[in-house]
Amino acid sequence: MAFLTHLLVCVFGMGSWVAINGLWVELPLLVTKLPEGWYLPSYLTVVIQLANTGPLLVTLMHRFRPGCLSEVPVIFLILCVGTTACILLAFLWSMTSWIQGRQHSVAFIVLTFFLALVDCTSSVTFLPFMSQLPTYYLTTFFIGEGLSGLLPALVALVQGSGITTCVNVTETPGTTLNPVTTMETSITQRTLSPSLTPLTWHLESRYLAPRFSPLLFFLLLSFLMGCCLVAFFLLQRQPWGRQGSIEDLLHSQVTLHSIKPRDTEDTGSVGAPVSSPGKGSVEVSVASLRPAQLAFIYSVVAFVNALTNGVLPSVQTYSCLPYGPVAYHLSATLSSVASPLACFLPIFLPNRSLLFLGVLTVLGTGFGTYNMAMAAMSPCPILQGHWGGEVLIVLSWMLFVACLSYVKVMLGVILRDRSRSALLWCGAAVQLGSLIGALLMFPLVNVLKLFSSADYCSLDCSA
């Protein structure tokens, strides 16, 4: 029975971000099909941030109208919306409309907004719901959340989404070049001059045909969202599924000073250290957290999510592609593997020391800084063209994700043991950090264009 519950919680957690993560890993294929081309990621960034109105509304409702909103029907609603949107996306993703004389993917963008609304709102509804279950299930929830990035990445890897190869292209000195604007690579259309001149050749990147279409990919996402909906329904039928709800959150003004600890039967007596079954005592006495410690925890939650959800994902292609498509796909896939593995670690090696978690945050930030530096140096970062550079960038991305994933899990466990309202504000901090990170990077990448891309096959950094 316990194993089944862990499985249901894992599947439930997987549904939190599986839809948007699926869209991101499918982008290399979508940008070659939709009229927005390589501007599509910019559109999605704006759309996803607009969807933060969902968690903002939920948080404000509980702040000013406590008790008027239960998380259970809200979760059922957003999961049904997410499943329906995925199914519609499978059949409507390529539909375009004319707006001001240009074609735009209106159906795709509108459905993406609903998927983003589902995933963003999950941060302030799924976590409070998890407070109804014993503490050790929260780690399983975060494992499922990590799988929400891994499973779509593996499917996209099997599909061959965005896989490129280097091909020889012959041309004459008199060739007329006509760039194709729908690709980011240097693929061009050429009109050969009639004069007989010596032929020259060079390497260019070409996209390989995917093994299956986006239709099947989005249907698989629909299946995963449907599994999450079924898992939540079954969790509701568990004995604790009817215990309390978000209605009792924030009955009084909620500030860092007024978040109350759980009853003594749930967290132990005031001032006593919290213990986990079979794991011995932990380093932080949850009931004795001071306002300054709570402020530190929420600040770290926002900072970590700003890095992992907003800042670094915006520059992953710039930091990895100069080392080649293999390094890029390994860093994307293995970092997705590192997240759920890091979420497993607290089961065996829990450490609630805020000092330790702070040091681990600094360490993860260091790996993120290396990734950002390589992106800023693109298209010719350190050790470009050397196997050591490829190994370093892949390891750096893996360790960056692993360190900060562990921090997120342990901070969530600490806040869960303090109160259910603390988990609600934890979800709000997650979304706030993600929003700040995305809004910070959008002008740097898309307006100021501080990062430069290049075609790996024709890249020459020997100068």
From Swiss-Prot:
Membrane-related topology note = Multi-pass membrane protein
Indicate which residues are glycosylated according to the record.
Answer: 168
Q: Where in the cell is it found?
A: Cell membrane
Give the record's keywords alphabetically: Cell membrane, Glycoprotein, Membrane, Phosphoprotein, Transmembrane, Transmembrane helix, Transport
Assigned GO CC terms: cytoplasm; plasma membrane
Tell me the residue ranges located in the Cytoplasmic compartment per UniProt.
1-6, 59-71, 127-137, 236-294, 351-353, 412-421
Swiss-Prot/TrEMBL catalytic activity: riboflavin(in) = riboflavin(out)
Q: Which family does it belong to?
A: Belongs to the riboflavin transporter family.
Provide the protein name.
Solute carrier family 52, riboflavin transporter, member 3
